[in-house]
């Protein structure tokens, strides 16, 4: 956790982070609610650090997926549903697979980003009580608990997976 105070020195941009940050800057100029770009960059840093060398079936780095989910969520919330255009939810989208797929824990997320983000990321995790549940069950849980704001993140997660499914079927 040595990165908490010096992540900025280690932060590197990439095409995926540039695309997301550019979208957020544009939305911040057009909406009354502003997303904290520095906090988003910190989340990008941790997503890239902890997803590390994981690769998607498309050959892209795995961290491209959560950054694209965050992009889709930002685009929707910034243009259509301003009440959910918030820093904590953009960060949740960026970190949505970290507890499930990396060594980044809920406690670590809480120390870095606070309990709201940590709880949201945990709610998006498909491992419940050491049992992996289906994507459908995960959606149903979020729906029945009326966690609409993070349900949108899960839906954009599924949308991005569907958009990129051709890689897993043909490659």
Show the residue positions of the predicted features.
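Active-site helical microenvironments for divalent-metal-assisted chemistry
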Residues: 1-171
């Amino acid at each position: 956790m040595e990165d908490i105070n010096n992540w900025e020195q280690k932060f590197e941009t990439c095409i995926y982070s540039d695309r997301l940050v550019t979208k957020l800057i544009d939305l911040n100029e057009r909406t009354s609610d502003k997303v904290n770009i520095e906090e988003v960059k910190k989340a990008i840093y941790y997503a890239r650090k902890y997803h590390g060398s994981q690769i998607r079936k498309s050959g892209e780095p795995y961290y491209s997926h959560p950054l694209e989910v965050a992009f889709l969520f930002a685009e929707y919330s910034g243009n259509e549903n301003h009440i959910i255009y918030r820093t904590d939810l953009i960060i949740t989208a960026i970190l949505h697979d970290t507890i499930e797929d990396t060594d980044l824990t809920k406690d670590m997320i809480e120390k870095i980003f606070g309990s709201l983000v940590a709880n949201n990321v945990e709610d998006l995790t498909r491992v419940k009580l050491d049992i992996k549940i289906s994507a459908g069950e995960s959606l149903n849980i979020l729906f029945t608990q009326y966690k609409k704001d993070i349900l949108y993140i899960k839906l954009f997660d599924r949308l991005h997976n569907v958009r990129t499914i051709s890689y897993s079927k043909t490659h």
